[in-house]
Amino acid sequence: MVNVAPTLLCVHAHPDDEALFTAGISSHYGDLGYRVVLITCTNGQLGLDDHGRPGSDPLHNVEVTRATRAAELQRAAIVAGFSRVVTLGYDDSGMRGWPQNDSPDAFMNADVGCVARTLAAVMDEVDVSVVVTYDENGFYGHPDHVTANVVTRAAMELAASPKRLYYPIAPKAVLEEFVAGAKAKGVFLPAWILEADHGVSDDTVSTTMDVRAFAKRKHQAIATHVSQVDNADLVTMDEELFTLLFGIEYYQLAWSRDVTSGDETDLFGGL
């Protein structure tokens, strides 16, 4: 009988989320020989365009942004250790309150059952053991992140192979220390950090992944999404600050098929 490598699946909303939130674990498990798969739900066409204009700007170039972000995603995924990338192609919904929220093609308006069936099919095809996506608040409230949680939870009920579901989270103490240090050094902080509701309590953390050995790779993955200049200061800030935020990844166990839990330093522990 041939032993098949365990599979990690990360479900993300936009191109660059895979670099910002989970590039540490994807690099770690990829280097261990695990199969690491990425599903990106939207094309990110409302991100910053080639002139740095957000999707809310009437002059924003949607077509250029869509193509640019697709290319950046493929390059960054390789850096971050993903062996396969699945893109669902839904439109970016934009931040809450943007007019694009009303588009029938926006991910937040997608049919949950339809998306869940697509995700479940991928989960079982790759025989996934561990799935990672955002918590119910989408980490910082973005509609597409919230929708990613909803459809992933629905897919877990349909798929036979997943054994665990984790959420990437930021402990309150870590986030506050980072934000204070960044502000003291004049670092521009993007919305996904400033609007993360001040982090979560320490007792929410079930698994702590020390990925400092992959900090440079995570830095490179973030930098690969060069069009998203709102993250530029994260790329240029000093190593100490970068490692404080990105050197340790924290996860909350949201669901487990078996009552047996893993250890506190391995998402696959005990499987």
Predicted segments with their positions:
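Active-site rim/loop-helix segments in enzyme catalytic domains that contact anionic ligands
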Residues: 1-126, 154, 158, 242, ...
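Metal-dependent de-N-acetylase/amidase catalytic core
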Residues: 1-9, 100-101, 105, 109-271
